[in-house]
Amino acid sequence: MAVAPNVSDLQSGVVKASQMARAALEHTLQHHQLQDFILAAILASIILLIIRNSMLSPLRGIPGPRLAGLTSLYEFYYDVIKNGTYAHQHPKMHQQYDSTIIRISPNHVHIADPELFAIGPAGSRFRKARYYYNSIGMSTAIGSHYDVEAHHRHRSTMAVGFSTKSLQAFDPIIVNYAREIMDIIASRGLKGTPVVLSHHTQAYTIDVVAKISFGQPVGAMHEVGDHPPTVQAMDCFSNHFNFTKHFPYWQLILPFMPTSAVKRIMPGVHYIKEVGTRLITNLIEQRRIEGRLDEEYQEGKGAIFETLLKPNPKKQYPAPDLNGLVEDACAFLVGGSDTTGLTLQAVTLFVLRNPDVLCALRAELDSASEFIRDSFDIHQVSKLPWLTAVIRETMRLLPPTPGPLPREVPPEGIRVGKYFLPGGNANKGPGRQPGDAEFRPLSPAVCSLYITIPASTQTQKGSSRSVGWEKAVRAWWSGGTHSVVDHARVSDASTSCAYFVFSSSIICGREQHTDERFLACRVAWHELLAFLALLFLRFDLELYESDETNLEWTEHMFTRIRAPVQVRIMKDRWA
C-alpha cells in the first residue's frame, strides 16, 4: 500500500536542493572571477611589457626585428626551437637594417664593429653577462666570473700552474698521449674500417686536460662503442646550454630532484659533474696518501688544480668548497676538450679536401720527421709553416665559440655611432645616482661581440673544396697579411675572444706565438701541433662520407657541427 509523501518533507527537500544549487552557482561565479582576474593580470603584464620594451626602453631606437625588441621569445625560437641558429641571423640583420648595431632581444644589442673587440680582454670595464656565463651552473668557475676582482684573484692564483716551467713539464704528456691516440686510431681503422674522428680528437683533449689538471686521465681515449660515454656527455653538455640560458632557474630545482630524474633531464651536466667530482676527490685523496695535504703546488711537478686547494692570502684567494672546485673542473674539461677537438676535426677535413695543401704539408712533415717520429720536439714542430698555416686558417673559418659572448655595458654607458647604450635603466631618485652606494642598475644593456664565420667557409654546390681555403692557407704560409679574405679584422679578432682557459680559439691571428693573456693557450696550441703532425706524417687518409657540409654549424655556446668527420686509413706508413 503506497504512503503519501509528507508535505513538510517535500518542502525541506526543495529548500536543500535550492541551497545546493545556489552554493554551486556562487562557487562557479567565484571560480570564473578568479580565472578572469588571472587572465586580466596576464594580459596587463603583457601590455606593460610591450609598452616598456617598445616605448620606454632606451634601446627602442636601435634597428632590428620589432618582435625581437618586444620579447626574448624571438631569440628563444632560434636558440631552442630552431636549434642554435640565432647566430646565423645576426649578419643578415646587419645587412637588412644597414646598421653596425642591431637590437636582437629586448635588452641585448649586437655590434658589427671590430674596434669594439677591445671590450673582451681581461680587466675590461665590460663585465661578462651573468645570464649567459652562469646559466649552465658554473658561476664560480674561472671563465664565468662576473666580479672582475674575483676573477683576478682566481686567475693570479692559478697562474703558477701555467708558468713556462709548468708548461714545459706538460709537453711530454701532450706528446705521449698524442702517440697513444695514434696507435688507438690505427687499431680501430684496420682493414679500412671508418674512424669517427670526433671520438678520438675529443677523447685525446679530455685526457690531456685531466692529466695535467688533476694528475690522472679520465680514460676517454680507451672507451669503445658507437657512443663513447665521455665524448657523448661532452656533446650533451653544450646541447643543454641554449635552454638553460633562457630558463636559468633550473639550477634551483635540480638539487631537489631524484638523481634518476636529473640524469634524464640533464644527462651531460650530470655526467660531467660526476667526472669532475671524482677527479677532485681523487686528487685530494692522493695528496693525503702522499702526506702532501699542506704542501703548496710544486711548479713543474704538480697538477694544476693543486694551486686551488689551499687559501692564498698573498693573492687574497679563499680556497673554494668542493662544489666550487667541481664547477672549475667541469669548465676545464668542457672548455679544454670541445673547442680543441673541433679544430682537430676541421683541420683534417679541410686538408684532405685540398690535395695541393695535403701534398705540401706531407712534404714538410717528411722533411721534419727526425724531430717528429723519433724524438718529438714541440718547439721545432711549432715552427713548421704549413702546419701552423692550416691550423690558423681553420680556426679563422670555424671558431670553436661562434656565438655572441655577451658583455654588459659599464655603468657610464658607451656610444656606438649615433646610439647611446646606457649602463642600466635605474631609478634615479634621491640617493640613486651613479657612483652612490645605493645605485643599482636594474637592467644593464648587453653588448654582444660580433664574431662571424666569413662567407668563404660556405661551399659551392658541386665544388670539391672550400672556397678560398687553399689560397688563404698559402697567405698564412707566405707570412703575408691576411688580405685575401674579407672581414679579416673581424675574424682575426674573433680568434682571441674565447674565455675558456684551454680553448683553441685563443691562438693569435697574426703572430707565431700564442696570446699570453689567456691561461693555457699554449697547451691547446701544442695539442693541435702534436696530434696533427703525427696524424698526417703517419697515415695516408681519405675522407669517408664527409665533406664541408659536415661542418655546417649551430651555436650552443660552443660550435656544434652537423655530423662528425670520418676518415679511412689507406696506409699506416709506420706499420
UniProtKB/Swiss-Prot annotation:
Residues reported to bind heme:
C521
Transmembrane feature ranges: 37-57
Which cofactors are required for activity? heme
Return the SUPFAM superfamilies for the record.
Answer: Cytochrome P450 (SSF48264)
Membrane topology for this entry? Single-pass membrane protein
| Enzyme Commission code | 1.-.-.-
Q: Which Gene3D superfamilies match?
A: Cytochrome P450
Gene Ontology cellular-component terms listed: membrane
* Glycoprotein as UniProt keyword: yes
Positions annotated as glycosylated: N6, N83, N242
Q: Where on the tree of life does the source sit, at the highest rank?
A: Eukaryota
Q: Where in the cell is it found?
A: Membrane
Q: Which InterPro entries match?
A: Cyt_P450, Cyt_P450_sf, Cytochrome_P450_monoxygenase
A single Pfam family, by name? p450
* Observed effect of gene inactivation: Abolishes the production of both oxepinamide F and oxepinamide E and leads to the accumulation of protuboxepin K.
Could you list this entry's UniProt keywords, alphabetically sorted: Glycoprotein, Heme, Iron, Membrane, Metal-binding, Monooxygenase, Oxidoreductase, Transmembrane, Transmembrane helix
Q: In which pathway does it act?
A: Secondary metabolite biosynthesis
Biological processes, Gene Ontology terms? secondary metabolite biosynthetic process
Q: Which GO terms describe its molecular function?
A: heme binding; iron ion binding; monooxygenase activity; oxidoreductase activity, acting on paired donors, with incorporation or reduction of molecular oxygen
What is the protein's known function?
Cytochrome P450 monooxygenase; part of the gene cluster that mediates the biosynthesis of oxepinamides, derivatives of anthranilyl-containing tripeptides that share an oxepin ring and a fused pyrimidinone moiety. The nonribosomal peptide synthetase (NRPS) opaA assembles the quinazolinone core with D-Phe incorporation. The first adenylation domain (A1) of opaA loads and activates anthranilic acid whereas the second A domain (A2) is for activating of L-Phe, which is then converted to D-form by the E domain.
Q: Which family does it belong to?
A: Belongs to the cytochrome P450 family.
Task: Name it.
Answer: Cytochrome P450 monooxygenase opaB
Source organism of the structure? Aspergillus ustus
Q: What is the lineage of its organism?
A: Eukaryota, Fungi, Dikarya, Ascomycota, Pezizomycotina
